[in-house]
Design a protein with these regions (language model features):
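N-terminal core-binding DNA-recognition domain of tyrosine site-specific recombinases/integrases
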Residues: 1-49, 54-56, 72, 93, ...
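Catalytic-site neighborhood detector that most strongly recognizes the C-terminal catalytic loop/helix
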Residues: 133-135, 228-253
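Short, polar N-cap/turn motifs at the start of nucleic acid-interacting alpha helices
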Residues: 121-126, 199-200, 220-238
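Conserved tyrosine-mediated DNA breakage-rejoining catalytic core shared by Y-recombinases
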Residues: 64, 116-159
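C-terminal secondary-structure termini that scaffold catalytic or DNA-interacting sites
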Residues: 126, 156, 160-163, 171-176, ...
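Basic, Lys/Arg- and aromatic-enriched nucleic-acid-binding interface segment
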Residues: 38-40, 53, 57-58, 62-111, ...
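C-terminal catalytic core of tyrosine-transesterase DNA break-rejoin enzymes
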Residues: 53, 102, 106, 112-113, ...
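C-terminal catalytic core of Y-nucleophile DNA break-rejoin enzymes
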Residues: 136-156, 165-189
Length: 258
C-alpha cells in the first residue's frame, strides 16, 4: 500500500482523509467487494477507538466515513460508442494515457499491478507481459498476452527506447524510474470522463471490465478467464452483466433426446 498512498510517520497523522484513501484503495485498487471495504472500515474505527483510549488520538477520524451499500458496484463497462469517443479524444489530447488505457483494456492487469510493471516484464517477441508474484493480487506469478494494437502503440511512442528497469507507466504515463500511484491514473481518467460528459459509473477499472466483456464475446469466456488470471469462470462471469453474459455456442446447436 505504501506505493499507492503517501505513508504516515506519526499516529496523529491518521486523519479522515488518510482513512478514506485507504478504504478507496481496498475497494477500487484491490477490487474488493463493498462488504470487504465496510469490514475494513469497522475494523479501522475500532482501532482508532483503542488509540483514543490510550491517548494517542483525540477523536476518531473514521466516524464521518459512511458505510456504503453492499449491492452491485456502481461501475459499468463502456458502451462501444463511448469507447470510440474515448479513444478518439485521447488520440489527440494524450496518446500516452491512451496507451495506458489500451494496455489495461487488453491485458486485464489490475491498476495497482500496472503501476509496478516494468519494461523488463514485457516480451515483444512472444507478445507477453509477466506479472511477478511480488506485485500480483493473488501473490502468484502470472503471464498475459499482449495484443498487437498495444505493441504497435508502444513502438509508435518509442516506449522501448527507455531503460528496461523503468516502470512502464510512471510520471506523465511514460516510462520512468519512479512509479506513480493508482490515484494519478484515476484522477486523470476522471477529468477525461468529465470532459466527455460520461456517467460516473465509468471508472478507470471499467477498462478492464470492458476488455473482459469484449474478449469473452469474441473468443469465449474461457479465454477471457485465462487472460484475467481468474481461478474459475464464475469469477469472470462477475464482470459480465446483462446482454454481455456469454453462453456456449454448443448449447445452441446440440441435438438432444427430447
Amino acid at each position: 500500500m505504501s506505493n499507492h498512498i503517501t505513508p504516515i510517520v506519526y499516529i496523529y497523522q491518521l486523519d479522515t482523509s488518510y482513512a478514506s484513501d485507504f478504504l478507496d484503495y481496498i475497494l477500487i485498487d484491490r477490487d474488493s467487494s463493498a462488504r470487504t471495504r465496510n469490514n475494513y472500515k469497522v475494523w479501522l474505527a475500532s482501532f482508532c477507538n483503542w488509540l483514543i483510549e490510550k491517548g494517542y488520538l483525540i477523536q476518531n477520524p473514521v466516524e464521518r466515513i459512511k458505510i456504503i451499500a453492499e449491492g452491485d458496484k456502481k461501475r459499468s463497462a463502456f458502451s462501444p460508442d463511448d469507447l470510440q469517443k474515448f479513444r478518439l479524444y485521447l488520440q489527440q489530447e494524450n496518446p500516452y494515457f491512451l496507451l495506458l488505457c489500451t494496455f489495461a483494456y487488453y491485458t486485464f492487469i489490475r491498476p495497482i499491478e500496472i503501476t509496478q510493471i516494468k519494461l523488463k516484464d514485457i516480451s515483444i517477441a512472444e507478445q507477453k507481459v509477466f506479472v511477478p508474484s511480488s506485485i500480483s493480487k493473488n501473490r502468484r506469478d502470472g503471464m498475459v498476452g499482449l495484443n498487437d494494437a498495444v505493441i504497435k502503440m508502444m513502438i509508435d511512442l518509442d516506449i522501448f527506447s527507455a531503460d528496461d528497469d523503468c516502470y512502464l507507466f510512471g510520471a506523465g504515463f511514460k516510462p520512468s524510474r519512479t512509479p506513480v500511484t493508482t490515484k494519478v491514473y484515476r484522477n486523470y481518467f476522471n477529468k477525461v470522463r468529465e470532459t466527455l460528459k460520461f456517467p460516473d459509473s465509468y471508472q478507470f477499472y471499467s477498462l478492464k471490465d470492458t476488455g473482459i466483456r469484449d474478449l469473452a464475446n469474441a473468443a469465449g469466456i474461457v479465454v477471457a478467464r485465462d487472460q484475467a488470471r481468474h481461478a474459475d469462470v464464475s469469477t469472470t462471469n462477475k464482470y459480465l452483466k446483462g446482454d454481455a453474459l456469454t453462453v456456449h455456442e454448443e448449447t445452441k446447436h446440440f441435438k438432444g433426446a427430447l
